[in-house]
Amino acid sequence: MPPLRRQALTLAEKKAIRKHYFESATKPSQQELISWFEEHFHKKLAQSTVSSILSSKNEFLDNLDAENSQIRRNRQGKYPILENALIDWQTRLQKQDGAITGNAIKKSAAELWRRIPEYSELPIPEFSNGWLEKFKKRCLKHGLKLQGESTSVNQGTYEENMVQIQELISLFDPKDIFNMDETGLCWKLIPNQSPASERVKGITRDKARVTVTICCNATGSEKAPLWVIGYAKSPRAFRQANAHPDSMDFHWRYNGTARMTTSIMEEWLRWFDDLMKGRKVLLILDKFVAHECALENIRNSERKLVNTTVVFLPVNSTEIYHPCGQEIVYAFKSYYRKYWLNYMLEEIRLGKNPSKTMNVLKAVRWMIRSWNVDFEPSIIYNCFLRSGLFQNQQPLTGPSPETIRIAVNLQELIGKYLGDKDIFQIENFINPIEENSADTNDDIVNQVAAQFLDEREFETDEEEEESQYLLSTKDAINAINTLLNFQEQSEDGNVLFTRTLLQFQKVLESRSIV
């Protein structure tokens, strides 16, 4: 079969392919996409072209306006991959009211150039003023802020916005008010040390870091499953243990910086909206670039949110009004650090190096337990009360007793680890500044450039290979029998626990029969 003759595609046609794929209730196969495109646009496509269009490097198409979308690829500049990345950078920076000057564009172009594999053996272009003017005409959106223009938040406007948000919140029952936030978590952080970092193709990133997305309602009665974003598509520790994230009650995503991106946030919002099926809920978010871009993509699509109303907190208000940004994230990290400290102490007692034996699967297990088991609804409810989001409710001051208790417990464990020989600020261990840095222009460049990093097989290169015995159904049944025997021999056995074990035993026995 002769190869397909290359046909120039407009950005609008590429955008249509992405829209049809990502907004379809049932994701079409690439062959189905090719047939659909030929039927609607009378052009033939190669499968490799479809794969490229659906990849993250073409995310910028989702926000492209109608006028610019008629530009054909062969009318782009000499370096289309770079220009697509620059459009992505520009969109993210504008969301933060950042000043996009000509010098900023040229500087970011040079930074991105060094990180794009296709250009690795080519000299860096001059990026002259002539190139800049042509690039602006070709690609930049109308309404671009140039020459240092940026918007600032007026205090009066800020207070008016909060009054309007409080009025909106008052229309919802507390059980239908949700807050979502993400936080970095350096899962091998050692007391009195900074997170270990590495430099990969010009990008500096923490070695053992994930981003954890947490979401809960105001009463604490509902905690959504965690979303964890790492570096590897399928970490080696997961494969060795044959661990399946869905079975563990969490969702795993990945990218080159282990941070929230527009595409992951858009996926999360649609997942959350499906989770709220049959309800009308309010979702409170902070004004983070990925949040805003994702919501804008959804609002401009045919498949909009049905069950969820989204409201953004004013800029620079998260320290005051953000429940998850206050004690909820702090408590979550405190619970996690407790498991990690206990693990370190035990490994050292056994003569092992915890930094080598630790892996991301163990970390995720502790995250899930911290969130699903250790977290009491009262902690979350009190955090919402302390936030001042509710009308006629003065924000409470000072940490809650539970948060203080967790910190005291951690301080005792740290004393055992350090041997009380060092002065130690516990805040630097529970919630280090490196995990919560704001997005600077360098951060945004890193996030855009991350799409060009090679896929990883592991989360850190320090992990020792760990042999895992794959359990059979018979092994699981035997383990349940052991637990049932333990319950029978306990004077204070838990009847509800016994019933749960019997139900699980029945399910496993039905599997073994099949």
From Swiss-Prot:
Entry's localization field: Nucleus; Chromosome, Centromere
SMART domains named in the record: CENPB (SM00674)
Gene3D superfamilies on file: Homeodomain-like
MF terms (GO), sorted A to Z: DNA binding
Primary location class: nucleus
Every HTH CENPB-type domain range: 70-145
Domain DDE-1: 172-384
Entry keyword set: Centromere, Chromosome, DNA-binding, Nucleus
InterPro entries, sorted: CenT-Element_Derived (IPR050863), DDE_SF_endonuclease_dom (IPR004875), Homeodomain-like_sf (IPR009057), HTH_ABP1_N (IPR041188), HTH_CenpB_DNA-bd_dom (IPR006600)
GO cellular component: chromosome, centromeric region; nucleus
PANTHER family the record matches: PROTEIN PDC2, TRANSPOSON
Biological role stated in the UniProt entry: Binds to the central core and core-associated repeat regions of centromeric heterochromatin.
Protein name according to UniProt: CENP-B homolog protein 2
Organism the protein comes from: Schizosaccharomyces pombe (strain 972 / ATCC 24843)
